[in-house]
Amino acid sequence: MMGKREALHAILNGQRADRIPVIMNAFSLPVARYGYTMAQVMQQPDKMVECMVGTRRQLGYDGLCLGVYSGITRQIAGHLPNSEGKIVGDGDDVIHSFEDIKKLKEFHVKKCPWLEKMKYMIYRMREEEPDEPIYVIVHTPSS
């Protein structure tokens, strides 16, 4: 059987893998398991690392996961109306045509503080589990 990284590389290269790597994508489960709130782990990255690494170890996932879910979409698409015609500021449900894509604002890394925290968390996760793949999920504006 393929190892975690071998299977991932095969999948990313469009090749056949004999297994599908499984990761923890829902941050709320690890956070709840450790008794923290989302606000706490967002403000204290070491708590997020504790939750994600500990849950991976306990449940045997094939890697660690981090994500930037709202910062990017808010920044580049929060000004656009959703399918109900409302501007709610979250950037969700706003891309319905090529014209909508043209209305996206430029993304500025320095205006997204969560990215800096993510770099730190990747460093900490690598310290804790040097052999585990780390998957970074970036949420983009959606239809």
Language model feature labels by segment:
Residues 1-143:
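Catalytic cores of TIM-barrel enzymes
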